[in-house]
Amino acid sequence: DTPEEILFFKSIFHQLLSLFTSPFHNKRFDFGDEVFWGKIAALGEQFSSDKQIRKMNGNRGSKHFLYMNRTGIKERRHVVKGDGDTTTTMGVKAAKIAIERAGIDKDDIDFIVFATLSPDYYFPGPGVLVQRDLGIKTVGALDVRNQCSGFVYAISIADQYIKTGMYKNVLVIGSELHSHGLDMTTRGRGVSVIFGDGAGAAVLSREEDNTKGILSTHLHSEGQHAEELSLIAPGMGKRWVTDIIEDNDPQDESYFPYMNGQFVFKNAVVRFSEVII
């Protein structure tokens, strides 16, 4: 790659990073063909403070410092149980703001791509629920389940739909409600201190100036490490709901998210830098 291309990719990376780390600022990103409007608009209203996260770590100062130092986490937002917020409702809130900031009407949306691994239902997916709740005409809705990289995959799908001329305005949503399914004891601290609840949305639209654009998208996977970050149950291949109910095993951890934190962190740092640079 030329130095100009490397700088371009780094610029995109930092703009996306800014989007996810500055939740209260409206943002407009110019990627050429596509104009990317977005805002992290919906966050869980209950938050876990530094003190609560430390308690989850067993009040072990060194372990707590390690988590904070490596992740930068100071608090985690969680949806208040019983208040009615779901992955879909947070996505709808974010989508409304993204559509408004894009300066278009909801009926100008041609397609919806929704990325999540914590859907309201096993099926149907949240894409059609958003389409219904926004009152958008019967446009297509696609759900993406690619874990932490789901929003990146969703953006890449929207990019291709726009470049091929199939759609003009694609609504992309990333929303997660993890807190209701996390092990909040010290046993689950490796995962629970990291994940929170929130949603972000973007509208990708075609512009007449086609001299710019997303130059390329690089998507990779390493399936040999799939179980290092996984949620095994319920699943048709291993443990279904009836298995969990019948066993009634309080020590069963298969229905909680699992992460080999050290392995995932090291692999992510190496692979992510390889792709970006």
List the predicted regions and their residue ranges.
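Buried hydrophobic positions in well-ordered alpha/beta secondary-structure cores of metabolic enzymes
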Residues: 2, 67, 98, 109-112, ...
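Phosphate/pyrophosphate-binding loops at sites that engage ATP/ADP/AMP, CoA/4′-phosphopantetheine
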Residues: 94-110, 275-277
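Conserved alpha/beta core of the MobA/IspD/sugar-nucleotide pyrophosphorylase nucleotidyltransferase superfamily
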Residues: 1-24, 29-31
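Flexible, glycine-rich active-site loops centered on histidine and acidic residues
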Residues: 163-199
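Conserved catalytic cysteine-centered active-site region
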Residues: 64-89, 117-170, 175
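Internal, well-ordered alpha-helical segments in soluble enzyme and binding-protein domains
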Residues: 5, 126, 150, 154, ...
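Condensing-enzyme catalytic core mediating Claisen C-C bond formation in acyl metabolism
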Residues: 28-84, 186-270, 274
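Short glycine-/acidic-enriched loop or helix-start segments at secondary-structure transitions
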Residues: 123-124, 182-184, 226
